């Protein structure tokens, strides 16, 4: 019975993918991801595997660091001062950016208080090695920041310095004063924001004129099947197959994202399509190392129920990896970097 309940619970998290389900899903799978990557992997993105010889020998952690570094260059962080990292996970990208651009003030916003608590502990060792590096933990143990709280107590410029701050809040109601930052970054997190339009509206509100919104996210390419009026569910399921369920996020098209950004007065400066350097090499890595990864994780499972649940979930992941590679090769899905300017 426990086995069936655990499996059903996991499947419901994937299918429904509301905010609470996403939190539960990430909290559930993250320990296994960390085991598979050596126990210290705190980045939660697909990674950028580039297109040169060194990437042939990359592992997922190295690819994730490459993607994080790419965001810093793409987002012109060297010209920035204050950054909001929306959907910051364990704040590992923020720590990497702080190491590369030590003058930055970075505010990590995450609705997942458990991840923020872990981040606060993981960031502590960096204080001793980075000049002017401090941590402010805001609302970590107080649940999610409500819309009312965000309105009453915005984070102002005077409260920020040369620091990394951790703020427990939703990206669709950002608790910050108007025009107080010059970068808003969503590194593989915007696909979870519901409704995404609210995140764009909030980003436009808190960005200074000329500030940049930087997005890295999976997308679907195209929005229609000719003149056939498919319902959204049927249309997406026909295209994505098993990924419709295992891709545990919203399935936004690039066209819809561009339209939403423009409606908020945000000018798109650049879009880079990097799907072939994300999905296909990641899928290849998993396929080639599947046996070892399975053994590594199963060796850390303590009960028969856990092993059986893992076998089911792993089979879904494997089939999803095959499908992801196929859809990327067919240009049905892509991974995009979007740079936008507040006019």
For each feature predicted by the language model, list its residue ranges.
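A short glycine-rich, Lys/Arg-flanked "PGG" loop and its adjoining helix->strand segment in the class I
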Residues: 197-212
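Class I SAM-dependent methyltransferase SAM/SAH-binding core
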Residues: 82-128, 132, 136-139, 156-173
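N-terminal auxiliary segments of SAM/dcSAM-dependent transferases
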Residues: 1-37
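A short SAM/SAH-binding and catalytic strip from SAM-dependent methyltransferases
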Residues: 183-195
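Substrate-binding/catalytic lobe of Class I Rossmann-like enzymes that use SAM or dcSAM, i.e.
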Residues: 228, 240-327
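Conserved alpha-helix/loop element of class I SAM-dependent methyltransferases that forms part
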Residues: 61-79
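Conserved class I S-adenosyl-L-methionine
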Residues: 214-239
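A short acidic, Gly/Pro-enriched loop at the edge of an enzyme's catalytic core
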Residues: 172-184
């Amino acid at each position: 019975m426990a086995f069936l309940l655990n499996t059903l619970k996991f499947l419901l998290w994937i299918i429904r993918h509301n905010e609470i389900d996403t939190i539960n899903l990430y909290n559930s799978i993250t320990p296994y991801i960390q085991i598979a990557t050596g126990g210290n992997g705190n980045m939660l993105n697909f990674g950028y595997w580039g297109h040169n010889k060194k990437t042939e020998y990359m592992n997922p952690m190295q690819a994730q660091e490459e993607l994080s570094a790419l965001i810093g260059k793409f987002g012109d962080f060297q010209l920035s001062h204050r950054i909001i990292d929306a959907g910051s996970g364990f704040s590992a990208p923020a720590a990497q950016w702080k190491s590369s651009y030590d003058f930055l003030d970075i505010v990590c916003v995450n609705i997942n208080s458990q991840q923020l608590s872990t981040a606060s502990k993981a960031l502590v060792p960096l204080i001793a090695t980075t000049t002017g590096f401090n941590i402010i933990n805001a609302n970590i143990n107080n649940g999610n920041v409500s819309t009312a709280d965000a309105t009453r107590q915005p984070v102002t410029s005077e409260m920020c310095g040369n620091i990394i701050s951790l703020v427990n809040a939703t990206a669709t109601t950002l608790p910050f004063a108007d025009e107080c930052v010059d970068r808003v970054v969503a590194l593989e997190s915007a696909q979870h924001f519901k409704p995404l339009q609210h995140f764009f509206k909030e980003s436009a509100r808190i960005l200074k004129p000329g500030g940049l919104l930087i997005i890295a996210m999976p997308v679907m390419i195209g929005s229609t099947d000719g003149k056939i009026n498919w319902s959204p569910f049927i249309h997406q399921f026909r295209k994505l197959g098993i990924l419709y369920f295992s891709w545990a996020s919203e399935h936004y098209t690039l066209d819809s994202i561009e339209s939403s950004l423009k409606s908020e007065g945000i000018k798109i400066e650049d879009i880079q399509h990097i799907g072939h350097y994300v999905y296909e090499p990641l899928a290849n890595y998993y396929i080639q190392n599947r046996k070892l990864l399975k053994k590594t994780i199963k060796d850390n499972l303590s009960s028969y129920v856990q092993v059986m649940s893992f076998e089911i979930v792993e089979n879904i992941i494997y089939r999803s990896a095959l499908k992801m590679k196929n859809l990327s090769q067919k240009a049905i899905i892509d991974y995009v970097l979007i740079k936008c300017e507040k006019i």
